[in-house]
């Protein structure tokens, strides 16, 4: 009996893209809610260390390059689109590696959430604001959180893989 060629299971993109889509959906819905509810810069304390505040980030993480002349909008958009292509390629090749793929799906969803902001608004909408005493962490959003969790899981997965190969 002749064997038929079939695509390897590693090519299953749909579940991982579904996770990315969920991240994008929650990120964009939260930003729309903040835009409709808050005035720019108004701070609403929820606890002694956490507030909601509407701020615009024209730069990258922690406001990096936010005061540049405007070129950064397109540079970070291109970077996000490039990351999307690389991540989709990696998901297609390594879709069977669950933790690795989950981390990439979270990073992808977060990156695209911020790319959407840059294309639609010209900046990223941030609103989660942590502060303790005189220390203040830069405001961020759900997309940034997904990117961070994805990056931590990616490092954890790699450390686990390296330890397992010893």
UniProtKB/Swiss-Prot annotation:
Pfam annotation, one family: Peptidase_A8
GO biological process, any: proteolysis
Keywords of the record: Aspartyl protease, Cell inner membrane, Cell membrane, Hydrolase, Membrane, Protease, Transmembrane, Transmembrane helix
GO molecular function, one term: aspartic-type endopeptidase activity
Domain of life: Bacteria
UniProt subcellular location: Cell inner membrane
PANTHER family for this protein: LIPOPROTEIN SIGNAL PEPTIDASE
Protein name stated in the entry: Lipoprotein signal peptidase
Protein species of origin: Burkholderia ambifaria (strain MC40-6)
Taxonomic lineage from the root: Bacteria, Pseudomonadati, Pseudomonadota, Betaproteobacteria, Burkholderiales
Gene name of this polypeptide: lspA
């Amino acid at each position: 009996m002749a064997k038929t060629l079939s695509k390897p299971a590693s090519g299953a993109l749909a579940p991982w893209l579904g996770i990315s889509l969920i991240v994008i959906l929650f990120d964009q819905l939260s930003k729309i809610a903040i835009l409709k509810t808050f005035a720019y810069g108004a701070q609403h304390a929820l606890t002694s260390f956490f507030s909601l505040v509407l701020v615009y980030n024209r730069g990258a993480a922690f406001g990096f390059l936010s005061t540049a002349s405007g070129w950064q909008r397109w540079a970070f958009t291109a970077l996000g689109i490039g990351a999307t292509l690389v991540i989709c390629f990696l998901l297609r090749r390594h879709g069977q590696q669950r933790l690795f793929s989950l981390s990439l799906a979270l990073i992808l969803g977060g990156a695209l959430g911020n790319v959407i902001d840059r294309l639609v608004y010209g900046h990223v909408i941030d609103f989660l604001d942590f502060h303790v005493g005189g220390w203040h962490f830069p405001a961020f959003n759900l997309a940034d959180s997904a990117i961070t969790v994805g990056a931590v899981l990616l490092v954890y997965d790699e450390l686990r893989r390296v330890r397992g190969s010893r």
